[in-house]
Amino acid sequence: MKNWIFLAVSIFGEVIATSALKSSHGFTRLVPSVVVVAGYGLAFYFLSLALKSIPVGIAYAVWAGLGIVLVAAIAWIFHGQKLDFWAFIGMGLIVSGVAVLNLLSKVSAH
């Protein structure tokens, strides 16, 4: 269970860092740039801890999939990014795929 918490912290760090990239204006603004570097540092550190017991394929699928959906949602809410019907369908498929990997696949670490 602890390793799944590490993975959640890793996803949080990656989402914060990726979301701050837009505000950093190509690393020309100090505070958002520091958030980007710190967020990715946090993300990869905790991902490495999670990989001690979660298979890399599962961990990366969860990390990348949920990261994509959360970053898109944040961009939609805070930056006014337009998402159409098919974007929501695609995000739903990503979440469904992550759920299938974790709930039904025999390669998942439970």
Swiss-Prot record:
The keyword Cytoplasm does not apply. It holds the Pfam family Multi_Drug_Res. Keywords: Cell membrane, Membrane, Plasmid, Transmembrane, Transmembrane helix, Transport, Transposable element. It comes from the Bacteria. Its main location: membrane. It is found in: Cell membrane. InterPro entries: Small_drug/metabolite_transptr, Small_multidrug_res. GO terms for molecular function: transmembrane transporter activity. One of its GO terms (cellular component) is plasma membrane. SUPFAM superfamilies: Multidrug resistance efflux transporter EmrE (SSF103481). It is a multi-pass membrane protein. Belongs to the drug/metabolite transporter (DMT) superfamily. Small multidrug resistance (SMR) (TC 2.A.7.1) family. This is Quaternary ammonium compound-resistance protein QacF. The gene is qacF.
